[in-house]
Amino acid sequence: MEFDTIAAISTFPGEAGIGIVRISGDEALEIISKIFRPFRKKDIKSVKSHTIHYGHIVDPETGEVYDEVLVTVMRKPNTYTREDVVEINCHGGIVVSSKILELVLKHGARLAEPGEFTKRAFLNGRIDLSQAEAVIDIITSKTMLANRYAQKQLAGVLGQKMKDLKNKIMELLSHLLALIDFPEEDVEELEREEIKRRAKDILNDIEYLIASSESGRIIREGLKTAIIGKPNVGKSSLLNALLKQNRAIVTDIPGTTRDVIEEYMNIKGIPIKLIDTAGIRHTDELVEKIGVEKSKEVLAEADLILFVLDASRDLTKEDYEIFDILSGKNIIFVLNKVDLPKKIDEEELKKLVGNGIIVEVSTVERTGLDKLESEIYNLVFKGKVSATEEEIITNARHREVLINAKKHMESVIEAIEKGYSEDLITIDVNGALNEIGKITGETATEDVINQIFERFCVGK
């Protein structure tokens, strides 16, 4: 596949020790030969692949030296894009790297679009679409566990899984086509039973992957953990204590928190998205009322609720009203302010909590926080919210595709059981095959491909 030559700054803009300008395409070596002056006189166009060269970037028209640089030459096909690639390592900072990029563009390159280097790697067959998505996940990973899964996907683990699944579906299709082409009444019933067995086997594989996607979402995006409670029970103090920094404003005035505050923390490799919410209560104050409504929206989407109660006060009607709207949620009851004289009725608390998890903490004295973190982690790994090393589906797009493939395979099994013709059954088998191809990119539409690469930054 032929493309023009593209270039972009691949490092984060701003003051830094090093900046990198990346060039990819057939004209990469020609362009660098015009603007690079190596200290050891050599023809940069004829140097060996994967070598580094020291010299100056110079404007050939004015003779002005832009910077002292290291130039890396990588020849196709053993490069990130499977094209000739040149990387200019210059001093960091917006001015130097921008001026070098301008010079590169002036001498024949085009400014790369977001994700275009990785898109070329995909279009040139170096990686599949799931591996391209893994690049984004590596860049945005919030913990080493999330990075580990993304690295597995980049290494092709998911692609191989899809290849194995695709082969199973193709074998099923070949059985069906054989029945269509060579119908024999005495063996047809046996063949249909074998086809049904294979279809169920494929369906089981797909269902296993779908089941893993909830754990994968948590590892990729974080466990959405809402800190809920009535005003002035210490929700913002709990957020600050868990983060070990003063992120939220804390006062003795009820209703201080008006908006939702989101921050990430890491518990043994699991990214935890902590969401501090406005205290839930009846109020006529407009801004606080909006905050309460936002709290209820967060509550509906949360994976886990930290329901904060005040140990220094009795349970109130507001506590019970909040508990009533938490039905069906994973809840840890956080009994805060245990450093103060305890006034909460223990029997009443037990009736409210039942068999639920209670953790006593003091955000003032920083006690009980390790216990709370352990309970959050245990909840993740006890199956209520699962996340195990074997799971590999971390992407919402992949989950949606697999759900569609599952529907096709369920239709295949139903059609076999109802005695439909092989011609009709093959329609859904081909449908499942088409869906699986969307994960690796073989059957993904151009719009889907473009949407994926638009999420990248320029230079990647």
Swiss-Prot record:
Sequence positions that bind Mg(2+): S236, T257
Protein keywords: Cytoplasm, GTP-binding, Hydrolase, Magnesium, Metal-binding, Nucleotide-binding, Potassium, tRNA processing
GO cellular component: a single term: cytosol
Subcellular location, record wording: Cytoplasm
Main location: cytoplasm
Enzyme class at the top of the EC tree: hydrolase
Gene Ontology terms for molecular function: GTP binding; GTPase activity; metal ion binding
Transmembrane segments annotated in the record for this chain: none
GO biological process: tRNA methylation; tRNA wobble uridine modification
Binding of (6S)-5-formyl-5,6,7,8-tetrahydrofolate, residues: R22, E87, R126, K460
Binding positions (K(+)): N232, T251, I253, T256
Metal-binding found in the keyword field: yes
EC code(s) of this entry: 3.6.-.-
Boundaries of every TrmE-type G domain copy: 222-381
Matching PROSITE patterns: G_TRME
The protein's required cofactors: K(+)
Binding-site residues for GTP, renumbered to this chain: 232-237, 251-257, 276-279
Function: Exhibits a very high intrinsic GTPase hydrolysis rate. Involved in the addition of a carboxymethylaminomethyl (cmnm) group at the wobble position (U34) of certain tRNAs, forming tRNA-cmnm(5)s(2)U34.
Subunit note: Homodimer. Heterotetramer of two MnmE and two MnmG subunits.
Name this protein carries in UniProt: tRNA modification GTPase MnmE
